[in-house]
């Protein structure tokens, strides 16, 4: 009887497949992506590598030592304090506690602050509160801290916003009116996003994470790209990550262009150059999970798309790896076995520069991803490598080499807790445990500025207050 291996369906249900069936599923998933995106299939060796990862006997797997990458985040602390019947675990805690828990307990390389409603439009009335929260977090934290939110252009349509719902207009065959409504909404999205981030950057934010870009289609992406363009012009030092909502940009409008490229119908490898052109530092591509397909099919399909996006992108790629995307099952408590295998495959086969940790409970998302492929933040040198990706648009290899040279260590040492513990204390760039008298918060980041030869916005903000 042929040996069967434990895998998952796209909804998280456990299944058992033979090696031959796994390879067949991998081939089919890769072929699907190749056909849709008009891109190459995975090679035979890459398919075998994926099969090996999926058939590994351990519950949790991880990347080979030395291949670790920085992680970024979607939804911020909501996975801890949120309790809306999805992936939040409802722990009563402040956002400062949530951010510091990710930094000190989870070993995150970066973190983000976000509003409970997690869209830019609802932040407007409470932006002063968000600015105060950002200031307090920046005073206490060392890793890069973003402000994260969704463009969420749907909030600008009735009944929540001022413009007529294009869906209703299209049902009445008022196509031109629907397009006009989308264009107005995109203008407001750009304006609101820029206004909010002007306030947050003045309060010390390292940057912004646009989460689920193009959720409302091509006009949503158009408004976001223009916001990125404006922010980059105003704030050359701002860290900007643009993460997508889905694998393909839906053509709700159908005629909008950016840089003379029609946005409707773009796949990840076609999205990347435009996002870089607008001024983003990091691109977060997405590939959707099909809940009725196997994890072998879904992961192969996702890796095929992302590998091509990494190849086409002029900037680092942090693939979105929350529940329901990136080959990960659509389940609020993503299975550790599926998450760690997908994480490893994206690094070792697709060649991503980082992982954008998405929606899911704390164990299933940040803990699993960081154990599988993260650089463990200030336990080692993950925060330093992340800063070079964002401040200088360095790909993972270049960023590691740069930081290793500054520290006078080998790139393998950058994720070595023993090496980095002593070095961080010696250089006074912040350590994960409480050491009396050691530099913390702003002081540690000022030392990081000198070490890496970069500017850090929270330090600039602090210096301006002293003047």
From Swiss-Prot:
- State the UniProt keywords alphabetically: Methanogenesis, Methyltransferase, Pyrrolysine, Transferase
GO biological process annotation, one example: methanogenesis
Q: List the disulfide bonds.
A: none
InterPro entries per the UniProt record, alphabetical: Dimeth_MeTrfase_MtbB
Q: What GO molecular-function term can you cite, just one? A: dimethylamine methyltransferase activity
Residues annotated as coiled-coil are none
Name the enzyme's class. transferase
Q: In which pathway does it act?
A: One-carbon metabolism; methanogenesis from dimethylamine
Per the record's keyword annotation, is Cytoplasm included, yes or no?
Answer: no
- List the catalytic activities from the record: Co(I)-[dimethylamine-specific corrinoid protein] + dimethylamine + H(+) = methyl-Co(III)-[dimethylamine-specific corrinoid protein] + methylamine
What's the family? Belongs to the dimethylamine methyltransferase family.
The function of this protein is: Catalyzes the transfer of a methyl group from dimethylamine to the corrinoid cofactor of MtbC.
Protein name from the UniProt record: Dimethylamine methyltransferase MtbB3
The organism's lineage?
Answer: Archaea, Methanobacteriati, Methanobacteriota, Stenosarchaea group, Methanomicrobia
């Amino acid at each position: 009887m042929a040996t069967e291996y434990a895998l998952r369906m796209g909804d998280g249900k456990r299944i058992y497949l033979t090696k031959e069936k796994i390879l067949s599923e991998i081939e089919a998933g890769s072929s699907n992506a190749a056909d849709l995106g008009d891109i190459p299939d995975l090679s035979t060796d890459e398919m075998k590598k994926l099969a090996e990862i999926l058939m590994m006997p351990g519950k949790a797997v991880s990347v080979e030592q030395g291949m670790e990458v920085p992680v970024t985040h979607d939804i911020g602390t909501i996975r801890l304090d949120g309790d809306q019947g999805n992936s939040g675990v409802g722990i009563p805690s402040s956002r400062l506690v949530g951010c510091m828990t990710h930094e000190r307990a989870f070993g995150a390389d970066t973190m983000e602050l976000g509003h409970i409603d997690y869209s830019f439009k609802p932040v407007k009335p409470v932006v002063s509160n968000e600015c105060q929260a950002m200031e307090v977090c920046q005073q206490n934290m060392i890793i890069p801290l973003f402000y994260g939110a969704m463009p969420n252009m749907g909030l600008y349509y009735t009944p929540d916003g001022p413009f007529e719902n294009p869906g209703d207009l299209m049902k009445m065959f008022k196509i031109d009116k629907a397009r006009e409504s989308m264009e107005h909404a995109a203008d407001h999205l750009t304006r609101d996003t820029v206004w909010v981030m002007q306030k947050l950057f003045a309060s010390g934010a390292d940057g912004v994470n646009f989460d689920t870009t193009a959720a409302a289609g091509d006009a949503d992406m158009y408004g976001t790209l223009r916001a990125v363009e404006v922010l980059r012009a105003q704030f050359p030092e701002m860290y900007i990550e643009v993460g997508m909502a889905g694998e393909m940009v839906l053509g709700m409008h159908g005629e909008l262009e950016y840089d003379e490229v029609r946005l409707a119908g773009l796949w990840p490898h076609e999205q990347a150059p435009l996002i870089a052109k607008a001024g983003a530092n990091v691109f977060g591509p997405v590939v959707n999970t099909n809940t009725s397909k196997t994890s072998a099919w879904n992961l192969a399909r996702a890796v095929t798309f992302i590998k091509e996006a990494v190849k086409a992108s002029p900037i680092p790629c942090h693939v979105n790896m929350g529940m329901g995307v990136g080959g990960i099952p659509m389940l609020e408590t993503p299975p550790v076995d599926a998450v760690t295998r997908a994480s490893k495959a994206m690094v070792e086969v697709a060649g991503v520069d980082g992982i954008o940790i998405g929606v899911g409970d704390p164990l299933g998302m940040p803990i699993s991803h960081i154990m599988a492929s993260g650089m463990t933040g200030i336990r080692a040198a993950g925060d330093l490598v992340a800063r070079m990706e964002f401040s200088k648009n360095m790909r993972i290899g270049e960023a590691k080499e740069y930081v290793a040279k500054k520290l006078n260590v080998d790139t393998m040492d950058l994720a070595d807790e023993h090496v980095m513990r002593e070095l961080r204390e010696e250089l006074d760039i912040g350590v994960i445990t409480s050491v009396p008298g050691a530099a913390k918060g702003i002081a540690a980041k000022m030392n990081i500025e000198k070490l890496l030869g970069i500017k850090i916005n929270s330090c600039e903000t602090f210096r301006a207050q002293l003047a």
